[in-house]
Every structure is written in C-alpha cells, then in structure tokens.
Curated annotation (Swiss-Prot):
Keywords: Activator, Nucleus, Transcription, Transcription regulation. Residues 262-273 have a biased composition (Low complexity). This is Mediator of RNA polymerase II transcription subunit 26. It comes from Xenopus laevis (African clawed frog). SMART domains: TFS2N. The lineage of its organism: Eukaryota, Metazoa, Chordata, Craniata, Vertebrata. GO terms for biological process: positive regulation of gene expression; regulation of transcription by RNA polymerase II. Its main location: nucleus. Residues 96-236, 254-418, 436-459 are annotated as: Disordered. The gene is med26. GO terms for molecular function: transcription coregulator activity.
Amino acid sequence: MTAAPVSPREIRERLLQAIDKQSNIQNMVAVLEVISSLEKYPITKEALEETRLGKLINDVRKKTSNEDLAKRAKKLLRNWQKLIEPVTQNEQLVRGIPNLPGSANGGGSHNCKADPAPTNLLAGKPIQELKGRNDIQKAHSPKADKTPKRKRKEHRDGGQGTPGHLSKPNHELFQNSSPPPTNGIGGSPPDNLPSPLDGGLQSNNRLEPAENDKHGKIPINAVRPHTNSPGLVKHPSTSSLLKVVVLQQHSGGLDDALSHQPRSPRCSSFSPRGTRAELATRQHTTYAPKGSAPSPSQRLPGVDSAHQSPLHPSTPPATAKRLESPRQDRVSSPHKPVEQLPSTDCHQVLPRTSQQHIPRSSLVDSQTPRTGFSPESSKLDSDDAASGSDNLKRKKSRLRIECEGQSADGTGKPARVKKERRLTFDVITGQIKPLTLKDPAQVESSAPTEQHRTETDKQDLTLSLPSPFQLTNWKELSGNEIIQSYLHRQSSLLSSSGIQTQSAHYYMSEYLKQEECTKRESRKTHVLVPIVLPSDLPGRTREITSSDTDRIQNQHWPGVNGCHDTQGNWYDWTQCISLDPHGDDGRLNILPYVCLD
C-alpha cells in the first residue's frame, strides 16, 4: 500500500513540532525528513503564501549549524523564489528591449524618447509582434524625415519665399489634422478661403504630386505619425496662428474690395514667424528714443511709395494731421535733440491712445503679418505714444500747480494751501499733535477749534487712559544704557518744545528710587527671633501646672512649641521655614529648631 500524499499544512505542522519558538532545531531527523519531502513535493505559489513555509525554512537555515542542511534549505528557497517571481522577470525582459529608431513621434533623424508602454499590456504580447510593428514604422520613416527638413529650410529662408512654398505646410496641416470645433466660422472647409490662399494650394498640388501620392500608399495597419508630434510640427501655436490669419482674411475680404488697393498687405504672407517678428520689432520701436532715426538697413526701397498709398483709408483727417506733424518736424531736423520719455509713460499711454484714435480696420491690419518691416509705421506708433504722453504730462503739471497754491487762471483767486501732515504722537497725553506749523495764518485760523477739541480730548483721556509710562516694565529698561540715553534725549526734546509734562526721565528716576528702597528692604536678613531664656522654667524652677499644659497645647509659646521669625510669622517645630540669613536673595530651607551659627 502506498501512503497518502502529504499536504503542505501537514508538512508545516511536522516542521513546527521539530523546532521551538526561536526556530532552534529540536528534532534533526524530523527536519531532514521535512526538507526531503519538500524537495520532492510539487508545491504551488498559493500553498507557499498560505502556509508561510518559506519563512520557516529560512529561519531554520539561519539557526542551524549543519552545513548540509543549510545548503539544501537555501537551494529549496531559491527554487521557490523562481516560482513566486516569474512575472517580474517577464517585465524586465520587456523593459530591456531597446527603443528602435524610426518611431512615429521622432522620425529617422530625431531619436526622441518614446513613452514606455504599460507593462500589463506588453507582458502578454510576443516579441515578434513588437518587432513587426517597429518594422512597419521603419518603412514609413522617410516621410516623417522629410517634413522636419522642409520645416528647417522654411525657417532658414525667413518667410521670404513665394506664397506657394509658404502655404504648403498649411495644406498638409489641413489634410492631417482633424477638423476644428465648429463655433460658427471655424468649421468652414478650405474651399471658402480667399483667392490668394487658393492659388497657393493649387500651385502646391501642381508642384508636389508625388508627396500626396505617398499618403495613399501607406498600408492600413501602419501607424500614421500624429500631427502633434515634435517631428512634424515644431511650434505648437502655428496652427492657431494660421486659423486666426485665415479668419481675419475672410472677414476683411469686403474691406479689400471697397478700398481698391493694388495689393493688400495682409495677403502677402502667411508665416506665423513674420507675425512674431513684427510684434517684437514694434515693441522695440515703441520703447526706443524718439530722436533716433531708423537705420538704412531697415529702410526698404519701396517704403516711401507704399506709405503714400492709402494703407489706412478710414483714418480721420484730424488724426492724420496730428500723426503727421511730429514726423515732419523730425524729418526737417533729424539731429535735433528731442526730450526722451520714460518707458513707463509710453507703456501707460500707448494702449489708451491706440484704442481711441486708430479705427478697427487699421487694428486688423496691425495684427496681420506683413512681408517687410516698415520704419514709417513704427514712427506713427511712437508719435502717437508721444502725443498721448504730452497730454499726460500737461495734466500732471496742472495738478502740481494747483497743489502748490498757484492759480490756474492767472487771476487773484485764493488758492488752496497744501495740507501739513507732519504730526507727532504725544506719549504723555496720548494725543496726536502737529509738530511744527509753517504758515502763521493757518495757526491763527485753526487755533480756536483745535484748542476746544483738544481740551475735551484731554479731559476724556486723563479720566480714562493711564499713562503708557506707568504701564511700562521699567525693570528691564533701567539697566540698558541705550534706552536711558534715548529717553534722556526725548525728554530734552519735549522740554525744549514747550510742553509742560512730566518726562520719561522723571518716571525713570521715580522707578529707580522705588527699586533702591525695595533693594534695601530685601537686603535685610530673614532669620528666626532669638529666644531669651526665661527665668521661670516649669519643671525645673517650679512644678508644672494645668495652665502650663493648656499653654503648650493651645497657645504659641516661643522656644517651647515653636518660634517666630523676624517678619512676625509663627512656625511650629515641624514646619519648614525659608530664610535669607545674608540678605543676598539666597534661600535656606530649614526646620525651626535647627541652630544657625
């Protein structure tokens, strides 16, 4: 007959019987049998977790002195460890696969770091499937490789190419990106764009038909590169800027038809870089000094003729005159020193004046990109800011004249006098008073009302508020020389100003006097009253009577049932007394019957 198979619980019980609580082996034969049975038994992970046999075997291995048993237990534990941790090894295998080039977000030339996939998804997939996916991505990496090169070429040209070349990335963006959210205008198809953009798209289709054919040759299962990947679109704000430009062109088409211009400046370029460059240069010219003339490199050959054409047709003639006159003065005398404005004035005045005097069409033109930078437009902006800052300066000077007491009309009207705000706080009375009054007329006019008000305030304050010097902790301040010199100087200032009050020095001296008195009193020694031996001693000179027993039980009898100290306190023989025999605040705790020499 064959024995029944042993379960892990029975093995655990047998092992626990063979060892004690500190895992010391009590029965070596039983432990060796348990190790042999565990080496033969096909144990599972669930059984190990349930019985905690690994911990028991490890404790036995540490405590045993038998090397053969320790080696067998260690080998057994290693086998169990492999059984418990296969999942982590698979994760390490998947994690150890290197990132292959040609991924969707990097292209061939950009070895961007790919985001690691979740391990729970990759653990169950074979490595061949991963290799197949990377091979598919490799096959289509030249397309992703061409796009960044073309982008770099456009940025090197600086946005000065033909409209057809510039609109090609826009055409790819419209094809690859998902349609924008329809908010009324943004969902319109590319067919509704103005004629220059249509021409650019048609020329783009004629120039590069092979590039568009490559999109159709991509297999269905291949991973298309995402439009937001850094290899395709370098600037995240490019698409948003292009949408703004297209919407502005679509809304401004009627204005272009009415103005009869030979060529509108907003239709010449669609490069978002031009927009940023122009905004930066406009800011620099706004904060530049007014007297500096533009350099010849900034002045283009067709600037003067283009400026004479009606770029701002809806500008009022009064505004044009006001904008034109400072520029004519500067042209007539270019080396004339002009007053430079602070940058803060220009910054404060420019938004206000530009919103007041520039109409809507010119604002739209200022937001749209232009082919070149015109120094004349920067002159107009700086002149506009200068005129607004002149008005602000005029207002400031008028306010300053009125505050200083001069009449604005030139007549003899009584002007307002500046308020005297030099006040001081009187620490004695707790009132706020003017320190010095410059104008004697003001002193005479304000004297009656001030006197009446301060008298009532004085009465209330003297009744209600104590002096702050009486509430001060003078013990801490009395030993400080800096505080003493400061208070002495303050008291001299108060006495020189004519205020008849008790100074801080007075309170300091009073406090010091009190401190001296208390110190003298504290220097007195605190001892027991010396007991004079009486001539009448009951029990020695005479017999003890009932009055003696009553006195010793119910009355204070110095030297018999207690004693007095120098402060008049009575102490029983069993009470502890705290004395100061030397007067130096040193306390001596003794019992009253102790004799002090």
